[in-house]
């Protein structure tokens, strides 16, 4: 992240104020203030993650993924024979924190801040799937979008989606 000295000074002052406003996280803010003041390039890259950007198209895709899981669970709940499909297979897992952190952050934002999909079970890890999921979800979306009744899926359609 490239910043002018004036921008670094402003951000440093912001971190200084945050140490006073949020004592529970004061140590973290002091560390970030030191990094900014001294211009430690390697550590300043951490700020890129904090100030990252998620394109509108990606946000819409993540919402589409969450909506697909909502439809899967509703459809599964309406099945006569729910035993044929394990409920865990139609439960949204989330994303991998190591490789998909921005996606994971957006899911948490949507649920915890925006109040959408609050019925999803975050588990003990808060939608941390512990394995990369993006490509799997893309395959699932392709199958789901091809279904004529996306919110009234048959057991066969549910299986096709979750096995994509």
From Swiss-Prot:
InterPro entries: UPF0304_YfbU (IPR005587), YfbU_alpha-helical_sf (IPR023146), YfbU_helix-hairpin_sf (IPR023145). Pfam families: YfbU (PF03887). It comes from the Bacteria. Gene3D superfamilies: Helix hairpin bin (1.10.287.680), yfbu gene product, domain 2 (1.10.3190.10). NCBIfam families: PRK05445.1. Belongs to the UPF0304 family. This is UPF0304 protein YfbU. The gene is yfbU.
């Amino acid at each position: 992240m490239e910043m002018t000295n004036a921008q670094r000074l402003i951000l440093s002052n912001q971190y200084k104020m945050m140490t006073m406003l949020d004592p529970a996280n004061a140590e973290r803010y002091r560390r970030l203030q030191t990094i900014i003041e001294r211009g430690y390039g390697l550590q300043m890259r951490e700020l890129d993650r904090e100030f990252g950007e998620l394109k509108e198209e990606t946000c819409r895709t993540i919402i589409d993924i969450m909506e697909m899981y909502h439809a899967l669970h509703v459809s599964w709940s309406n099945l006569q024979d729910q035993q044929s499909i394990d409920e865990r297979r139609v439960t949204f897992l989330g994303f991998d924190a190591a490789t998909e952190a921005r996606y994971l952050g957006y899911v948490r934002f949507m649920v915890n801040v925006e109040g959408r999909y609050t019925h999803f079970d975050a588990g003990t890890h808060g939608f941390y799937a512990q394995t990369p999921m993006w490509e799997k979800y893309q395959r699932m979306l392709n199958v789901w979008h091809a279904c004529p009744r996306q919110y009234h899926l048959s057991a066969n359609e549910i299986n096709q989606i979750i096995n994509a």
